[in-house]
């Protein structure tokens, strides 16, 4: 027969007291005991993408996966997040499994390359062990692993070229993510995994595209972003950049399936000013008449390129537009020391 309500409450309190004694205070708590704090974020560098993510950037203490075709802008998005974390006084690490990080390009995007922790590991096990140790130090704000496809298991490197190693990488990723997820939440570190696309053979219906490294990352990631290049930007006949579309295909901290479009300029990265113009026009802060762009009665320029240059030279105007857009849409403040004190890492859920 079921226990009476007072007896059940007493039994629960005794169990909770024993758990606190064995595992430390706060091991189990009621969700309503404390006021839920806003989720701390790291801005992406594109206000359009921050809006699509729903909380103003990438959530701290979570796993984020960025995937897409080659040269679509995956590493650029990750490096902008690194630059924004560093600008707020954070510490960043980059696990360069592809051995392809360009320090000069990273510097142009605003990354403090002198302070950036970089590792170019020999094997997938070494890469993930280094990542785990850095996360568990509790000192890291953001960690980028570029890329999952390049995390080659030690057995594959030491074996012959034609040897079969079925499922080795998937098992490696599954084990690593099991270890990392709790540590990420405790330390408030954002882990960005950059991934490549492959095609499944014999798929008749639906998309044949899939990501490398098995299914574990799909489950553990709180945010998954599909990055695609949709258009080449030209200045006359010269290609100067790409128009990029990002679809948030999974989001545990906000409604998913939102899209963002922004410009990535060659050698400069994400055009913050271009995103502000797009979002400003969309939400009525910037008026577009023909090819002219006007803000608050002041002409920004004829054509998007001239308007972009105006905002580049007039930072106060750009900041004012950004503030108005964020206030209207109610998206979070940037990762500052003050915001860090008030905001907590997003709680882990599966």
Curated annotation (Swiss-Prot):
<dbReference type="GO" id="GO:0006281">
    <property type="term" value="P:DNA repair"/>
</dbReference>
<dbReference type="InterPro" id="IPR023400">
    <property type="entry name" value="RecA_C_sf"/>
</dbReference>
<dbReference type="GO" id="GO:0009432">
    <property type="term" value="P:SOS response"/>
</dbReference>
<dbReference type="InterPro" id="IPR049261">
    <property type="entry name" value="RecA-like_C"/>
</dbReference>
<keyword id="KW-0963">Cytoplasm</keyword>
<keyword id="KW-0238">DNA-binding</keyword>
<dbReference type="GO" id="GO:0006310">
    <property type="term" value="P:DNA recombination"/>
</dbReference>
<dbReference type="InterPro" id="IPR003593">
    <property type="entry name" value="AAA+_ATPase"/>
</dbReference>
<comment type="function">
    <text>Can catalyze the hydrolysis of ATP in the presence of single-stranded DNA, the ATP-dependent uptake of single-stranded DNA by duplex DNA, and the ATP-dependent hybridization of homologous single-stranded DNAs. It interacts with LexA causing its activation and leading to its autocatalytic cleavage.</text>
</comment>
<keyword id="KW-0233">DNA recombination</keyword>
<dbReference type="GO" id="GO:0003684">
    <property type="term" value="F:damaged DNA binding"/>
</dbReference>
<dbReference type="GO" id="GO:0016887">
    <property type="term" value="F:ATP hydrolysis activity"/>
</dbReference>
<dbReference type="InterPro" id="IPR049428">
    <property type="entry name" value="RecA-like_N"/>
</dbReference>
<dbReference type="InterPro" id="IPR027417">
    <property type="entry name" value="P-loop_NTPase"/>
</dbReference>
<dbReference type="GO" id="GO:0003697">
    <property type="term" value="F:single-stranded DNA binding"/>
</dbReference>
<dbReference type="GO" id="GO:0005524">
    <property type="term" value="F:ATP binding"/>
</dbReference>
<keyword id="KW-0067">ATP-binding</keyword>
<dbReference type="GO" id="GO:0005829">
    <property type="term" value="C:cytosol"/>
</dbReference>
<dbReference type="InterPro" id="IPR020584">
    <property type="entry name" value="DNA_recomb/repair_RecA_CS"/>
</dbReference>
<comment type="similarity">
    <text>Belongs to the RecA family.</text>
</comment>
<protein>
    <recommendedName>
        <fullName>Protein RecA</fullName>
    </recommendedName>
</protein>
<keyword id="KW-0547">Nucleotide-binding</keyword>
<keyword id="KW-0234">DNA repair</keyword>
<dbReference type="Pfam" id="PF21096">
    <property type="entry name" value="RecA_C"/>
</dbReference>
<feature type="binding site">
    <location>
        <begin position="68"/>
        <end position="75"/>
    </location>
    <ligand>
        <name>ATP</name>
    </ligand>
</feature>
<keyword id="KW-0227">DNA damage</keyword>
<dbReference type="GO" id="GO:0140664">
    <property type="term" value="F:ATP-dependent DNA damage sensor activity"/>
</dbReference>
<dbReference type="InterPro" id="IPR020588">
    <property type="entry name" value="RecA_ATP-bd"/>
</dbReference>
<dbReference type="InterPro" id="IPR020587">
    <property type="entry name" value="RecA_monomer-monomer_interface"/>
</dbReference>
<keyword id="KW-0742">SOS response</keyword>
<dbReference type="InterPro" id="IPR013765">
    <property type="entry name" value="DNA_recomb/repair_RecA"/>
</dbReference>
<dbReference type="Pfam" id="PF00154">
    <property type="entry name" value="RecA"/>
</dbReference>
